Swiss-Prot record:
Location of the IF rod domain: 80-391
Protein name (record): Keratin, type I cytoskeletal 19
Source organism: Homo sapiens (Human)
Residues carrying the site annotation Stutter: A267, T327
PTM-bearing positions, type Asymmetric dimethylarginine: R24
Pfam families: Filament
Region (Coil 1A): 80-115
Family that this chain belongs to: Belongs to the intermediate filament family.
Region (Linker 1) residue spans: 116-133
Residue ranges, annotated region (Necessary for interaction with PNN): 244-390
Record gene name: KRT19
Amino acid sequence: MTSYSYRQSSATSSFGGLGGGSVRFGPGVAFRAPSIHGGSGGRGVSVSSARFVSSSSSGAYGGGYGGVLTASDGLLAGNEKLTMQNLNDRLASYLDKVRALEAANGELEVKIRDWYQKQGPGPSRDYSHYYTTIQDLRDKILGATIENSRIVLQIDNARLAADDFRTKFETEQALRMSVEADINGLRRVLDELTLARTDLEMQIEGLKEELAYLKKNHEEEISTLRGQVGGQVSVEVDSAPGTDLAKILSDMRSQYEVMAEQNRKDAEAWFTSRTEELNREVAGHTEQLQMSRSEVTDLRRTLQGLEIELQSQLSMKAALEDTLAETEARFGAQLAHIQALISGIEAQLGDVRADSERQNQEYQRLMDIKSRLEQEIATYRSLLEGQEDHYNNLSASKVL
């Protein structure tokens, strides 16, 4: 607290109390200087003066320079009286303002103290036991991310393998269709050969029937010729021996039989060789077809296994993505809650700073008021000292 004081010498007039003090002028009456108190933000200002003895007239300033100044012998006249009255009024209003500001300042200090007691930082919480859980969750998230990347890589590899197997399957399927087309062509050739064989068998049967018919005709002709030859022999006994027709027919018969047998053997040999060749080709293509079918079956089984594995990997990936999204959402909600708490604390801190700034401005304003009051008090003091000198001069002149 800063205090200002000044002393007054003896005078012959009297003034009433200023603020909480009182001034009386008269024979043997003491004058106590006014007391001014003001404060802002826990600081105070006081102005006090010493007492002096006076006599003669009496007057009063009550309620903080709120009284009326009285003088005798025309000591205070004209502008000086008005100036003193104006200073009285202004000082009274300033004191009222100071009291009101002190009351408001006290209320603000009480409110700030209550707010700090209610909103002050509580005991610091120990979050160290959450760090292990957070680190474990981070490790799990990192592991899940790595596992997800590995699964994605495996899925890509499986997709590439599936594409490769699909290409092989399409190639084998095209080869199978080509082999089936060749088999169908060979079957048509086999059908044609079967028809040719049947035709040849029918031709052989026809040749056999024709041979039998020729044999029968030959025998009939031989019988007829024998009958004719026998009749001629009986008629012409003395004639020379004729041509042996039986031998000629027998030779012709043997030649036809040899030719027929040769044709039959040639046809059977050609048919047999052709049939064996076709059977070998059919067996080779059948074996190749069986191999292709078994390979296609294996490829289809492998493709189904890869598709099942792909579906399982996709399901695992979806589950991991859901887990990751849930974890991110949970941590996002916690982070948003913490951010909201931080924002609320920052807002409260901003309010406190604004209140502090406002109180600082109020304090500066009160200091300005205090400076002006000090200047006016100095002016008031100079006026009082001038009046004391005037009273002293008048007293001295009366004594003389």
